[in-house]
From Swiss-Prot:
This is Aspartate--ammonia ligase. Pathway: Amino-acid biosynthesis; L-asparagine biosynthesis; L-asparagine from L-aspartate (ammonia route): step 1/1. The keyword Amino-acid biosynthesis applies. The gene is asnA. GO terms for molecular function: aspartate-ammonia ligase activity; ATP binding; catalytic activity, acting on a protein; transferase activity.
Length: 336
């Protein structure tokens, strides 16, 4: 269990005021996101059938929460880790056209999450996906989209600051871009997480690109990514430097999704060629799914960031080890 206890931490909002602020942030940001990205709110599942191949395998070792159901006794159901693959299928199923997209209010359970100030077994995020042309599968498209999301976050920050002056954390005004290989070349002696902290402190807001493939120096990936949704050459994480905890905080993970060619290549690298037989993967390899860009934006993380909170448990209700609860209480961190 990792836990950062900031010195002299005193929340500026009561629990009830915090709850009101959470509602305001969520409603404000999703309106900004829908407007700036041009995406429509759609209903989304909390669970999928395992055999569909639609669940997010994350790093390949996390165990999904699974159960059976009376109505379909021979089908194994899984609570989603994310909606990365489901969204791409939904765009086709619901008849979305070129440059149209959707966003959802996603709730997930990640039972194997390592808990700390930023991580909970309960995940809530705005999951979004948008159709693009094959020729738009490039770095320019990715960076333009990142800047739109950053714009939505900054617009929300401005409104939250006006409503809760003195209780809003000030974000950087610009977002920079860097690749994982550039980070390794610059700080080869540091771990990937240490590199992220270094660049976040330096830039205040940064989008770290190309996550999932092996780096040249270490021969290891910067971080794990499932091989069947993001194109590892066209993805990344949006992170901010968070002064209260002297740490980086990741708010969004996103990317241009795999093409037929990159899916085959990445499944081979991950030794997951057997997934080619699953319904989703088969459709993709047969060219039956649209080319897309998409990602997730953490709802609790954004609330935590904008309200200057010390722990994600101050803005969402979850389950925490007793030791963590006690240490937080002694440091004026009141977990919901």
């Amino acid at each position: 269990m990792k836990l950062i206890l900031p010195k002299d931490y005193h929340p500026t909002l009561t629990v009830r005021d915090t709850e009101a602020a959470i509602v305001y942030i969520r409603e404000t940001f999703q309106d900004k996101l829908a407007s700036i990205l041009g995406v429509q709110r759609m209903s989304a599942p909390m669970f999928v059938e395992k055999a569909s191949g639609l669940n997010d395998n994350l790093n390949g070792v996390e165990r999904p929460v699974g159960f059976d159901m009376k109505a379909i006794p021979d089908s194994e159901i899984e609570v989603v880790h994310s909606l990365a693959k489901w969204k791409r299928l939904a765009l086709k199923r619901y008849g979305f056209g070129m440059h149209e997209g959707l966003y959802t209010n996603m709730n997930a359970i990640r039972r194997d999450e390592d808990l700390d100030n930023f991580h909970s077994i309960y995940v809530d995020q705005w999951d979004w996906e948008k159709i693009i042309a094959k020729e738009e599968r490039n770095t320019d498209t990715l960076e333009v989209t990142v800047m739109k999301i950053f714009k939505a976050i900054k617009a929300t920050e401005k409104l939250v600051t006006a409503r809760y002056p003195g209780s809003t954390y000030r974000l950087g005004d610009h977002v920079s871009f860097i690749t994982t290989q550039e980070l390794e070349d610059r700080w080869p002696e540091l771990s990937p997480e240490e590199r992220e902290n270094k660049i976040a402190k330096e830039e205040k807001a940064v989008f770290i690109m190309k996550i999932g493939d092996k780096l040249k120096r270490s021969g290891k990936p910067h971080d794990g990514r499932a091989p069947d949704y993001d194109d590892w050459q066209l993805n990344g994480d949006l992170i901010f430097w968070y002064e209260p905890l002297q740490s980086k905080i990741e708010v969004s993970s996103m990317g241009i999704r795999v093409s037929e060619e990159s899916l085959r290549e990445q499944l081979k690298k991950a030794h997951c060629e057997d997934r080619e037989k699953l319904p989703f993967h088969k459709m993709l390899l047969e060219g039956k799914l649209p080319y897309t860009i998409g990602g997730g934006i953490g709802q609790s993380r954004l609330c935590m960031l904008l309200l200057g909170k010390a722990h994600i448990g101050e803005v969402q209700a979850s389950i925490w080890p007793e030791e963590m609860i006690e240490k937080c209480e002694s440091d004026h961190i009141h977990l919901l």
